[in-house]
Amino acid sequence: MADNLEPLEPSLQNLVEQDSLKWIFVGGKGGVGKTTCSSSLAVQLSKVRESVLIISTDPAHNISDAFDQKFTKVPTKVNGFDNLFAMEIDPNAGLNELPEEYFDGENEALRVSKGVMQEMINALPGIDEAMSYAEVMKLVKGMNFSVVVFDTAPTGHTLRLIAFPQVVEKGLGKLLRLKMKVAPLLSQFVSMLGMADVNADTLSQKLDDMLRVITQVNEQFKNPDQTTFVCVCIAEFFSLYETERLVQELTKCGIDVHNIIVNQLLFLQNSHDSCSMCASRFKIQEKYLDQIADLYEDFHVTKLPLLEKEVRGPESIRSFSENLMKPYNPKGEPKE
């Protein structure tokens, strides 16, 4: 690109101020501080949005540790906030991870549909995780949060999360065809148990409803006005390599990505006062920061500091989140 182009604002202010955004994914290599960054972003969004939900799709469920509060698969208000909620799901658990209330109903059909759907899904390798995402999306859309932030698992899981609408759309067709085969058996089985209200049409309707939601989500995921992805990395070779792979895959999937967070940076004010290891690490980070500047000159690149203490608890996250909105200043910002 031309040298006279102005660098983009080195913060996430552009995302926080984009009122149209509905889905924001935060991801990257393991151990780079995704959860701290996603939690901090959610805190900043809660200042300008009516209601914010942060969802952890990482089986490690670090947002409970980050906010120092236990979260479950049901949205729970974060302590110290009026409009920030959090929930944790394990996509590997499939439909068993969903709240039981989702399958409650006035007749036996809805109460047994969870088990039947799980058995049908198990017949299609690879779709279980995608269906879990699909059901979560259906639940979340019904809750009408202003914006949803995803604290994703390491890169491989993240790419599957992004691709799940296409997987589900293909898989639902197979499920509906499978339904036609098992419908007679299902009807005989439930008749023996005296559950006259249960029929294959109930399951079919549930799958059709889900397909409509997923088609809509798929369209929203590829709309940069509604969905974007924030890549988190550290200034090291493997993390930068993983970030570039992630950016390329997201671009291939049609997902907007124009923000990168470089976390855990050393800000040496006086190299003479630093230890030899710190000075060495600083030089390594400077080398990769130069590469990031060359690779992502059309991205907003936010630089975050390595702190002496861990960022944990709502007040600590609230304080750290300010670094997302304006460039970190080691002289003006006291260390936590």
Swiss-Prot record:
Gene Ontology cellular component annotations, sorted alphabetically: GET complex
Any one Gene Ontology molecular-function term assigned to this protein's record: ATP binding
Chaperone found in the keyword field: no
EC number of the protein: 3.6.-.-
Active site per the UniProt annotation: D58
Keywords, comma-separated and alphabetical: ATP-binding, Cytoplasm, Endoplasmic reticulum, Hydrolase, Metal-binding, Nucleotide-binding, Transport, Zinc
Residues that coordinate or bind ATP: K29, G30, G31, V32, G33, K34, T35, T36, E236, N263
Bilayer-spanning residue ranges: none
Top-level division of the source organism's lineage: Eukaryota
Subcellular location field: Cytoplasm; Endoplasmic reticulum
Top class in the EC scheme: hydrolase
InterPro entries: Anion-transp_ATPase-like_dom, ATPase_ArsA/GET3, ATPase_ArsA/GET3_euk, P-loop_NTPase
Binding site for Zn(2+): C275, C278
Location (main, coarse): cytoplasm
Record GO biological process: tail-anchored membrane protein insertion into ER membrane
PANTHER family: ARSENICAL PUMP-DRIVING ATPASE ARSENITE-TRANSLOCATING ATPASE, ATPASE GET3
HAMAP family assigned to the protein according to its UniProt record, in alphabetical order: Asna1_Get3
Stated family: Belongs to the arsA ATPase family.
Annotated function: ATPase required for the post-translational delivery of tail-anchored (TA) proteins to the endoplasmic reticulum. Recognizes and selectively binds the transmembrane domain of TA proteins in the cytosol. This complex then targets to the endoplasmic reticulum by membrane-bound receptors, where the tail-anchored protein is released for insertion. This process is regulated by ATP binding and hydrolysis. ATP binding drives the homodimer towards the closed dimer state, facilitating recognition of newly synthesized TA membrane proteins. ATP hydrolysis is required for insertion.
Subunit structure comment from the entry: Homodimer.
Name this protein carries in UniProt: ATPase ASNA1 homolog
